[in-house]
């Protein structure tokens, strides 16, 4: 059975274009995988930023963790497990000031963990999360996908590749201020064309 992990990250909640787009992508995937399990995580509802306590918790052996460290590690491990168990990731990438939202960066920090999602070898890093697919819902008011102003999509593609997820598609509803209806129509066409 297919497991789909949906990651929303917009602070606009239900009004977010990226949320509408992740839903459309999810609907398209469910047409092909009607029995899929869907796991959703809304990062705007909160995800811990990594800090010294987080680092100390996840890299301390479980039997040596304090009670506080156990709680921190439990949450971090749950985020990691969601990605490990997913076959397909649907990730909202709303662009804020040319980059990704802070909460999406925090999620990436949770999943880019040495020994869990990648290892270092003599020849360089090797991602461990292979065999997965990611579909990214890229939305922006004025930043075109892939332009020199876009510091979000290349970053996310690189991070996903670093952890082993190299099958990555982008569906864009970009430059919304220059024609929201046209941007959404292009995005809808891209969703319809996705190989589910």
UniProtKB/Swiss-Prot annotation:
UniProt GO MF annotations: electron transfer activity; FMN binding; oxidoreductase activity, acting on NAD(P)H as acceptor; oxidoreductase activity, acting on NAD(P)H, quinone or similar compound as acceptor
Function of the molecule: Quinone reductase that provides resistance to thiol-specific stress caused by electrophilic quinones.
Free-text remark on how the cofactor is bound: Binds 1 FMN per subunit.
Entry's family note: Belongs to the azoreductase type 1 family.
Catalytic activity line of the entry: 2 a quinone + NADH + H(+) = 2 a 1,4-benzosemiquinone + NAD(+); N,N-dimethyl-1,4-phenylenediamine + anthranilate + 2 NAD(+) = 2-(4-dimethylaminophenyl)diazenylbenzoate + 2 NADH + 2 H(+)
The protein's required cofactors: FMN
Positions contributing to FMN binding: 10
Subunit structure, as described in the record: Homodimer.
Pfam family, one: Flavodoxin_2
Organism: Cereibacter sphaeroides (strain KD131 / KCTC 12085) (Rhodobacter sphaeroides)
UniProt-listed Gene3D superfamilies: 3.40.50.360
Top EC group: oxidoreductase
Keywords: Flavoprotein, FMN, NAD, Oxidoreductase
Name under which the protein is recorded: FMN-dependent NADH:quinone oxidoreductase
Enzyme Commission no: 1.6.5.-, 1.7.1.17
């Amino acid at each position: 059975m297919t497991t789909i992990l949906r990651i929303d990250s917009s602070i606009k909640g239900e009004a977010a274009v990226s949320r509408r787009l992740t839903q459309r992508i999810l609907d398209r995937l469910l047409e092909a995988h009607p029995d899929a399990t869907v796991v959703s995580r809304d990062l705007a509802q909160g995800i811990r930023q990594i800090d010294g306590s987080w680092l100390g918790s996840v890299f301390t052996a479980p039997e040596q963790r304090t009670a506080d460290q156990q709680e921190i590690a439990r949450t971090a491990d749950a985020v990691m497990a969601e990605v490990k168990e997913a076959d397909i990731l649907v990730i909202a990438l709303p662009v804020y000031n040319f980059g990704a939202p802070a909460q999406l960066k925090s999620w990436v920090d949770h999943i880019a963990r040495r020994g869990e999602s990648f290892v270092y070898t003599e020849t360089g890093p090797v991602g461990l999360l292979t065999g997965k697919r990611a579909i990214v819902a890229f939305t922006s008011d004025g930043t075109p996908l892939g332009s020199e102003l876009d510091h979000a999509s290349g970053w996310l593609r690189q991070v996903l590749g670093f952890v082993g997820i190299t099958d990555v598609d982008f569906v864009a509803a970009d430059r919304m201020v220059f024609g929201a209806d046209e941007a959404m129509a292009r995005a809808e066409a891209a969703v319809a064309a996705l190989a589910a």
